[in-house]
A protein has these predicted regions:
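A structural signal for short, well-ordered beta-strand segments and their strand-loop junctions
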Residues: 8-9, 44-46, 117-119, 150
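Short, C-terminally biased terminal segments at protein or domain edges
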Residues: 142-157
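An acidic/histidine-cluster motif and surrounding catalytic segment
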Residues: 66-67, 140
């Protein structure tokens, strides 16, 4: 039996569920959640995601929190191990210091042994340099590698 992949859902993915300005990406994102509902994947977010969502306009907060509840996304907590690993990503120049939350997303997924980070952030996360650097750092520190993909690369249909 094939192991169900464990996905870390980044804040950008939750925002794209409601992104009327990019209907193609919105539909791909909704398809991903359909596959999550069908239990093709285990799906997780973190308290960092919740904190980022809380900075959105009130209506968007309600929509996203409702979506999180509807799809039963498990919330992982940032801990000292994840903070330390995130700092290593920043020290290595993989993530700019002003984007600590992005480093935390990767670190939380890594320390919780998830398989894939699903994210729409092409600016500095879904990039070859970042993927290679993160996995090099992870291996050097005794963690397993992690995949970083957009929803378009994850959906099966």
């Amino acid at each position: 039996m094939i192991k169900k992949l464990l996905l870390y859902i980044d804040t950008s993915v939750l925002n794209y569920v409601f992104a009327d300005n990019v209907p193609g990406d919105r539909e791909v994102t909704r398809e991903l959640f359909k596959e999550i509902k069908e239990e093709r994947y285990g799906a997780f977010i973190s308290d960092v995601v919740i904190a980022e969502v809380s900075r959105a306009p009130e209506q968007r907060i309600k929509e996203i929190l409702g979506w999180i509840e509807q799809y039963n996304l498990e919330v992982l907590e940032v801990d000292e191990e994840a903070r330390s690993l995130a700092a290593r990503y920043i020290e290595a120049g993989l993530i700019p210091p002003k984007y600590l939350d992005d480093a935390l997303h990767i670190a939380i997924a890594t320390v919780n042994n998830l398989d894939v980070i699903v994210i729409w952030n092409f600016e500095h996360i879904v990039k070859l340099k970042t993927k290679l650097g993160v996995n090099g750092t992870n291996m050097m520190l005794g963690y397993r590698t992690i995949e970083i993909y957009s929803p378009r690369e994850v959906v099966e249909s």
